[in-house]
């Protein structure tokens, strides 16, 4: 979920314009659902973004592919927006635009996006308990977890939200213990 600052700066006006338009046209729920589904789809099929981001592929070819694969799956306005991105040669920013747009929606709806890195996948019960605790800590009505599994953490989990990082990993505890022992043994 880390975003290139330059890409974010370029993508932000597009996300804001789509957000404003979707609110104005009363289609925010449809566009949001489209973007949530697209986000999952792009994560599952990374070759699509490689193709769309390829400068050798013409805008016409990109439009044809999107028409074939996504037109029937998306709200008409969402699809038109994708075509605008292709025409303006900004389709490569789609993942960043999606993230920025969803952040705007979640901020409005008091939904917090929280990144969690864990050594092992969470069970459903663990996820629900973590969401419950995070709701209490953040006063958000809803929490959206973005979970990544990172076996280098050894055990535990790491929570990132906005500028806060809460580290409950065994790797961090071992590093802290090593620092403490280094300090004690330097007599």
Swiss-Prot record:
It is found in: Plastid, Chloroplast thylakoid membrane. InterPro entries: ATP_synth_OSCP/delta_N_sf, ATPase_OSCP/d_CS, ATPase_OSCP/dsu. Its main location: plastid. It holds the Pfam family OSCP. GO terms for biological process: proton motive force-driven ATP synthesis. Keywords: ATP synthesis, CF(1), Chloroplast, Hydrogen ion transport, Ion transport, Membrane, Plastid, Thylakoid, Transport. F-type ATPases have 2 components, F(1) - the catalytic core - and F(0) - the membrane proton channel. F(1) has five subunits: alpha(3), beta(3), gamma(1), delta(1), epsilon(1). CF(0) has four main subunits: a(1), b(1), b'(1) and c(10-14). The alpha and beta chains form an alternating ring which encloses part of the gamma chain. F(1) is attached to F(0) by a central stalk formed by the gamma and epsilon chains, while a peripheral stalk is formed by the delta, b and b' chains. This is ATP synthase subunit delta, chloroplastic. It comes from Thalassiosira pseudonana. The gene is atpD.
């Amino acid at each position: 979920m880390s975003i290139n600052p330059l890409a974010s700066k370029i993508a932000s006006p597009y996300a804001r314009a789509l957000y404003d338009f979707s609110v104005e046209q009363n289609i925010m729920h449809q566009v949001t659902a489209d973007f949530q589904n697209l986000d999952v789809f792009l994560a599952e099929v990374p070759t699509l973004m490689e193709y769309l981001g390829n400068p050798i592929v013409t805008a016409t070819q990109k439009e044809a592919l999107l028409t074939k694969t996504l037109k029937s799956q998306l709200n008409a306005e969402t699809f038109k927006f994708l075509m605008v991105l292709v025409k303006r040669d900004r389709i490569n920013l789609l993942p960043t635009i999606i993230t920025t747009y969803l952040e705007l929606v979640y901020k409005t709806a008091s939904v917090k996006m929280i990144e969690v890195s864990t050594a092992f996948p969470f069970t459903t019960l663990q996820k629900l308990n973590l969401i419950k605790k995070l709701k209490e800590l953040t006063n958000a009505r809803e929490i959206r977890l973005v979970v990544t599994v990172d076996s280098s953490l050894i055990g535990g989990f790491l929570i990132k939200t906005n500028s806060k990082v809460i580290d409950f990993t065994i790797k961090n505890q071992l590093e802290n213990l090593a620092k403490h022992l280094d300090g004690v043994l330097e007599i």
